[in-house]
């Protein structure tokens, strides 16, 4: 056991069981008072991204026990970070570790075009948790040559992750094909209706299986008509063993055990520092899930986690979101460690308290509304650290758990990541002004845009995802709507937020000063969906990512259905295209109509209807408009994406006792990634 973990748990506690976490950086009491220079939010740019930092206001005010709790959860989060790499692609860890060895140890000339290009490629791999773009899902195209790569490997005096009995030359040849051949595993996640989505996707959730084989396998496991069912496949990889589909479960003693044992050790330590019994019970149930791999235990944990609404500190840790699975079943590892932001929580808490009113006033068919909304809680959080699929890019809002039956019977938690949103707002620049048409739209956005965006996230997470109900006997989205389920669910939640954005109820609740805030939200959404988000797609490519598809589905559908009344107008000025909302009230009506239809599709499992909507409105891009948007962004010099360097927590020791935890704000992305690679590389390169 590491000295720091021993200082938290003491000898002979349950956290002694399992693997020893690595010894973290630590400080003595004399070193515990850092002096920070002026805080820079943006610290670096490369490729199509910029690297930001966020502050963690309020951390220093936490008491010592709470800081120890946060520190244990921080370590548990980072111990699982490399699981995400392997889940996304079977070669990610071998490529990543090879490039890291070159970056650390190559003794030759580093001031060459090839070495600079290799360094850039490695940064992109770190940013995406793999060799495919984190948003567009296309494989990166290296700007260094295959021969240069081979020379770098041969010339670096370091150990590389060779397979058993593999020669260095064979290893180089294998990775060269993976990195440089554009036809090999070109797309991380393919959701095209024209192909088998499994055989055309590089993601590492399945091996040697077709989409029909997987669907048949889980159809046999599903209980006909059951409503309270586990999330089949969530924490496993499905492979063929002797021709039979077999799940490799991710748990202690199973797949990824080397990392999961460390996660469990730190969660055990965290449980000893728990704030209250509810938090302690939830952490113990999470530990049990990691030990057993049982999805019933996962449900038990989620129920306990939803019930813990009083704790100041919170954590998401597990196999959570299913966006990286083309079938929408398997969760990618992520963790978010946070504590409550009391000031911002008052706003989101007001929305949560009115959840029944919102449900009653949904434009759904009556049978698709919940008669009684249960256990909706909402808060704004201050993020301490994120890892796995939540880092370096991060959500700005979270609503969990994803299980419909747990939401219905036990409720859900919704959070807004307040300090992350603040960091984004600090670097917004002139993008909104570039794509806004006239003075009224610009002034409205400058006055209300930040509040409009915040309320949209709150309504999306707190009300949107938790709204509505399935008709009796209808299965979960991955069974009924398959590869279109995630797009529908994100569109449904966005439409809920949009539908209520201009409702006077928000003024009555004190959430906004006037419906002009809602008008700003409509302007923002249409600008982003029909113009701004196109900057995130390479020319000639379709939309693949679920959030992008959802936005274009909504906006393109509303534009087409409002043409007769000129609700949204396409205008041109100085050779630039704009989409202008002329009638916000009629646009709200259109949003309500589409929301009713999407809820009907979800509630009834109408696959044909969602396929028609997505393929008609959400996939294809106007090539001329696409090129125009890319050119306008290039002139602005604003990268399409942003991610974060995370804070570092350093335990402060007096002898063997932790007396404090210090927070530091690193500003070097490469240094942090190499530090993480040194401290948290628990998994074999080949799994």
Predicted regions and their residues:
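Post-HEXXH active-site segment of zinc metalloproteases
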Residues: 468-491
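N-terminal-proximal low-complexity accessory segments that begin disordered
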Residues: 34-98
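An active-site-proximal "capping" alpha-helix that borders the catalytic cofactor pocket
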Residues: 63, 276, 486-503
């Amino acid at each position: 056991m590491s000295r720091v973990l021993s200082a938290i748990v003491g000898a002979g506690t349950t956290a002694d069981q399992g693997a020893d976490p690595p010894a973290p950086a630590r400080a003595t009491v004399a070193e515990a008072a850092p002096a920070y220079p002026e805080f820079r939010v943006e610290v670096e740019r490369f490729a199509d991204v910029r690297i930001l930092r966020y502050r963690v206001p309020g951390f220093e005010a936490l008491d010592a026990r709470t800081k120890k709790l946060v520190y244990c959860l921080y370590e548990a989060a980072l111990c699982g970070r490399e699981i995400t790499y392997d889940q996304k692609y079977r070669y990610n860890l071998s490529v990543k570790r090879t490039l890291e060895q070159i970056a650390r140890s190559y003794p030759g000339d580093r001031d060459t075009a090839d070495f600079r290009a290799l360094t850039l490629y490695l940064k992109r791999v770190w940013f995406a948790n793999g060799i495919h773009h984190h948003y567009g899902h296309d494989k990166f195209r290296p700007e260094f040559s295959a021969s240069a790569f081979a020379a770098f490997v041969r010339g670096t005096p370091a150990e590389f992750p060779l397979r058993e009995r593999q020669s260095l030359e064979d290893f180089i040849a294998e990775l060269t094909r993976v990195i440089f051949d554009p036809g090999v595993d070109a797309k991380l996640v393919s959701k095209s209706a024209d192909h088998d989505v499994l055989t055309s996707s590089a993601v590492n959730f399945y091996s040697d299986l077709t989409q029909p084989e997987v669907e048949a396998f889980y159809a046999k496991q599903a209980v006909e008509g059951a409503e309270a069912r586990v999330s089949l496949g969530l924490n496993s990889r499905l492979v063929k063993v002797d021709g039979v589909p077999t799940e490799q479960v991710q748990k202690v003693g199973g797949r990824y055990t080397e990392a999961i044992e460390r996660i469990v050790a730190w969660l055990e330590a965290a449980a000893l520092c728990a704030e209250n019994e509810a938090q302690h019970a939830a952490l113990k149930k999470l530990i049990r899930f990691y030990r057993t791999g049982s999805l019933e235990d996962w449900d038990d944990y989620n129920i306990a986690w939803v019930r813990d609404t009083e704790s100041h500190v919170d954590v998401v840790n597990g196999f959570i979101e299913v966006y990286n699975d083309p079938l929408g079943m398997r969760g990618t590892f992520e963790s978010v460690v946070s504590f409550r932001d009391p000031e911002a929580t008052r706003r989101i808490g007001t929305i949560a308290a009115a959840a029944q009113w919102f449900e009653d006033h949904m434009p759904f068919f009556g049978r698709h509304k919940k008669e009684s909304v249960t256990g909706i809680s909402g808060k704004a959080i201050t993020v301490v650290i994120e890892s796995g699929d939540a880092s370096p890019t991060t959500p700005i809002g979270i609503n969990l758990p994803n299980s419909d039956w747990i939401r219905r019977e036990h409720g859900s938690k919704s959070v807004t990541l307040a300090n992350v949103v603040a960091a984004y707002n600090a670097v917004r620049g002139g993008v909104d002004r570039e794509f806004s048409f006239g003075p009224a739209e610009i002034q409205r956005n400058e006055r209300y845009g930040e509040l409009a965006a915040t309320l949209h996230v709150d309504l999306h997470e707190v009300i949107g995802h938790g709204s509505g109900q399935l008709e009796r006997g209808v299965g979960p989205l991955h069974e009924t709507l398959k590869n279109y389920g995630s797009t529908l669910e994100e569109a449904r939640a966005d439409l809920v937020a949009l539908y209520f954005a201009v409702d006077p109820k928000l003024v009555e609740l004190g959430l906004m000063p006037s419906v002009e805030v809602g008008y700003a939200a409509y302007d923002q959404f249409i600008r982003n969906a029909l113009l701004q988000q196109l900057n995130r797609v390479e020319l000639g490519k379709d939309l693949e990512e679920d959030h992008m598809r959802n936005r274009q589905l909504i906006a393109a559908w509303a534009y087409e259905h409002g043409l007769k009344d000129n609700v949204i107008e396409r205008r041109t000025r100085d050779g630039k295209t704009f989409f202008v909302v002329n009638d916000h009230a009629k646009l709200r009506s259109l949003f309500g109509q589409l929301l009713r239809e999407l809820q009907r599709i979800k509630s009834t499992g109408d696959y044909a209807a969602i396929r028609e909507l997505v393929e008609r409105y959400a996939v294809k891009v106007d090539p001329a408009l696409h090129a125009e948007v890319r050119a306008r962004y290039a002139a602005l010099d604003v990268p399409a994406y942003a991610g974060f360097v995370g804070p570092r927590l350093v335990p402060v020791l007096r002898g063997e006792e932790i007396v404090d935890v210090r927070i530091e704000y690193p500003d070097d992305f490469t240094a942090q990634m190499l530090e993480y690679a040194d401290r948290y590389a628990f998994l074999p390169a080949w799994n």
